[in-house]
Amino acid sequence: QGFLRAFSEPRAARLQRVSLREFDFSDADLDALCNQALVELDLTHCEQLTARSLRSLRRCRRSLTALALLGCPGVFCEPRGGAGDSATTGDADSAGAAGRDASLACFERLRFVSLGALPRGVDVCGALGSLPALGALHLSSTELPEDPSFLLRWSATLRSLGLHNCGATPAYLRAVCLLGELRHLDISRDKAVGQQCVPLTRGALCGLLQGLPHLEALDLSGNSFAEGCTVGPDEEAPCAGSTDPSDSSIVAFRCRAQPLQFLGLFGTTLGTARNIPAHVVTGEESEAHVLNAIEAYTDLRPEVASTAINCLFVLARVSRCQQPLRALQLVVSALRRHRYNRHVQVTGSAALFYLTGSEYRAEHPETLRRQVLSVVLNGMEAYQEVTVQRNCCLTLCNFGVPEELEFAYGRATRLLLAILQQPTQDSVQRIAVHLCNALVCQVDHAHKEAVGRMGFVRTMMKIIRYRLLRKTCDQVMEFSWSALWNITDETPDNCKIFLMLNGMPLFLECLHEFPRKQELHRNMLGLLGNVAEVKSLRPFLMTTQFVTVFSELLESDADGIEVSYNACGMLAHMLHDGEGAWGDVRPPRHLVAQRMWSAIARWDASSRRNINYRSFEPILRLIPQSVSPVSQHWATWALYNLITVYPDKYCPLLISENGPQLLLGMLGSHTTHADTKEKARWV
């Protein structure tokens, strides 16, 4: 609001070329900008503007050479109530046409004009005026006068004519044939518009191509064609894919000496022709034609571009793309250009999933992959509907999370949590929880703490409670506990949030309701192991109820040794606090210690692990002590197992955290068990 008024003084900031496409601003704002000697001005789809803006633009009539007013219905129509800044254009269709002021007649230097979607009753001829220098006229979705002769006033100057969705009649086609200087002609239409259209005949096409000898680009997309426009099987040239006009499968083009630079055939039966005499062709059949269509129509025809992107989606789903880099760039461009167009977002996000698959990854530069992620997040932000959310989440799964999302980590997390906080399909929720889990895995404490403050823990626990209420233990339930395990890793604040939100009763309920779900048990015990590592939080675990459960889980063989290992780790930290902290909790401390010794003795030291340590600090703190020998033994066994099975990964980590020195110091302790010393020497 009012931003453009900052540019009202040319001496402070000189502007010549300005694009305000799809901006929402007032007549008064544009009036301030008209103090500039503007040369080019794009006001496409600035729907709030009225006839007052056109009067303001008259101050630029001596400098303005290009003006785009496509999708500005009120500019040529005086709204009821006058042309004041407070007037609206909501009922522009029923408003009376403006008088002589609503005309471009005084803009004698204009060479490019784009109009479209004009209200009924607007006199197109009067709105345009004479415009003696006009070289390009683009009309779109506008009711044309019955008499096309007004076009002939520019027969000597017009190089480009666009009549998209104008329903060009045979009379107009005959008039166009008299515009001998035309290089570009667009008589395409959108099938979705539903307007009656007379099929183009072989004679009409021949008339255009013979009457326009300089024609370089012709768009016929969306039109229907009468019989006889293509050659019969006997007349077909023996070659295929030729651009030579003499080989053309479309009869009318055989009269040309040179192929066209561009030919639009999207949504037509001619797109399947064997030989098309043009270097760039839009169509639906081949990948190249589809990509050309996306490129040609993205800017001003989002609905057509959406249809073309859907064609690309179908092709990419069943076969490998031949131009994957170009395809991805075009889809990203369309999604960025039409962030709030639902059709583009739905088809574009679906296509992205296939275009970012692993088979194409090596061809994608880092900058492009980041652009893909940005448009995916834009789609998630703009649309809450299931289709877009699912497509966007699936596409994110094709990327390295969290590393490739580092540049937008906070935003991505907020958007995923927003999806999970709203009712949605289980399939979308499953993917979103999986991504949330990946986001908090292998990131530093600062990231985890920030995510915790966003409500991550609360959201996961809400999902778990809902699944528990339905007595359902599925991937969503397991992923949610896994996410809680990851976000609480060495992050005391998040551990505390879990406890404050009644996490321990939730753990017991899940354990009771799903006694045979091994993956669930492993994830829950991993989380509680993180809680047990926080000294200030261990008193919350030091109850008879919890200690009884933990000690019973020492006997579990669920998921190999994982559940028993995690339960033992929790108890190791609790025993490390000493007799005083244990108090009168049952079972007694010495009995729990015996069970821990027995459990550790049963474990296979060569077991492969479903666990990932970023630091050994919580384990190493149990080494230099004599309060709990079994805690010391568990820590030593853990190190022994990890560096035996994964030496390349964990030996450097142990050395970097001073582990060997701590183990050497332990060897001289008379309270250390012999088995513990044996493991320590090997380590």
Kindly give the residue locations of the regions a language model identified.
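Eukaryotic short linear interaction motifs
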Residues: 50, 75-77, 145-146, 169-170, ...
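Flexible loop/turn segments at the boundaries of HEAT repeats in alpha-solenoid HEAT proteins
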Residues: 30-31, 54, 78-80, 126-127, ...
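Concave beta-strand-loop units of leucine-rich repeat
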Residues: 19-25, 42-48, 68-74, 90-93, ...
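Alpha-helical scaffold repeats of the Armadillo/HEAT/TPR superfamily
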Residues: 180, 200, 233-236, 281-289, ...
